[in-house]
Each structure stands twice: as C-alpha cells, then as structure tokens.
C-alpha cells in the first residue's frame, strides 16, 4: 500500500512515542501516535489529565526532541523551534516590564524584517486581536482575556504556518472564554493557517475544530478521531452538536455511569439533559 504524498504545510506525525524517566525507570507518556493534519485545518485534541496532549504539542513545537517516531511540517522534520510554528500557552507568559506592543515586538527579534516592517506587523496584529487603544498597556493593566489576546497576537506576528494552542482559555471565566473562542475562530478564518488546540473542554473542542482527536491516558494514545461536519458559526444547542458531544463524552465515561447518562430516549429523541446545564459541566477533569 502506498502512502499519500505530503502536501504543502501539512503536519505528519508518524508512530511517535515518548518516555520520561521516573525513579530510574521509563514512564510511557505517548504511545504510537500517528496523525496527519491538513493545511489550514483546525484540529482539537481533547483528553483528561495524563493523556499526554500537552506533551504532544511540545513535540510539534520543537520544544522537546527526545522521542521516537517522526514529526514533519511541510515535509521537513521538526528538530527545533521555528518561527513557522507559533505557540500560545494557558498562562500568557508576557514580560511584565513590557507593554502589549513591546511584548508582540519581542517575538520579532529574529525575524528578517526592517524596523519599519516590524512596527507595521505589530500594529496589524494589535488590530487583529481587537486591542487598538491598549498598545501601551502593561500586562498588570490588562484583564486575563486581554492578556491572552496579546499572547495570541505574539504567536501570530511571525506569520507562522502553524499555531499551537495549549489550553489557552483554561484559566479564564466562562464568559471570557466564550468570547475568546469566537475571536479565535474569526482569526483562524481570517488567517487560514493550521491550528492545533489542546483542551480538556469537550464543547470548546467541538465548537472550534474541523476534527476532534480524543486521547486516552497512561500512556497517551489516540482513542479516535471525530469529523465535525457542522456549519460555522456553530450552535451548542444544535441537536447535531449535542449528539457529537455525547459521542465524544462516551469515550471518557466511567464504568456504571455511561449507561445511566446515555439510555436510549423514547421515540428516538435526544437523551434528557438537566435544564440550563452549564458548559463547564462538560469539561474533563484535570
């Protein structure tokens, strides 16, 4: 059987395994991960604590080269960090002594741009994330959501092929998280770059992703991949969305709970849900 050729900007992860040393013995963190991400695709990776999803993101970013298997971006093996792979973490990691603009500008230190081009790129990305008027604000003067917008702008300012997002909204309140999910979707539609989001929030994964990769823990492995063939913008109250959410949650159900929560409803309807169930109820335990 022949393997399909890798297209431009495609991410190809083949038989990747990762171990850490624990008390002198190897601890398996990832086991035989194989995944191909298409150019411009938004892929969500969801799983509970210990499934290795953040470790996988670090490997793709080039922050850790100690693993078995291969990771290629646009046909080139990932050996180190690169301006072509931006990353955003759960904590914004802004320099507290720099303003919003200066934090974004700092990411351009190694970019082959003139000073004028760098200033223009910073201004463009300040506008892209909706922070006009806050260019000179310091991190302590920004809300958590605004600080994450700066972090996203910093991750995008080098115009990477891929943006990696490691639970970027996990520390935010539900309302701010919802707003930034919409903002991230708008940015993705505008930029049309590949995005890989790691999250433990099933709703977030389905709301944003073209595909959702579910991971099982210890060692981390891909449980299955779900295509999210729903139009954008998506509605969480859409019966199709709810069915997909239930299907994904079934992968994480504890024995004895799944049958009670997923009993077949009468007349082929949807399983009953408590009224006004908050989105946070569908976030997996850390």
Regions found by a protein language model. Give the residues of each.
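Conserved ABC ATPase "signature" region
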Residues: 116-134, 186
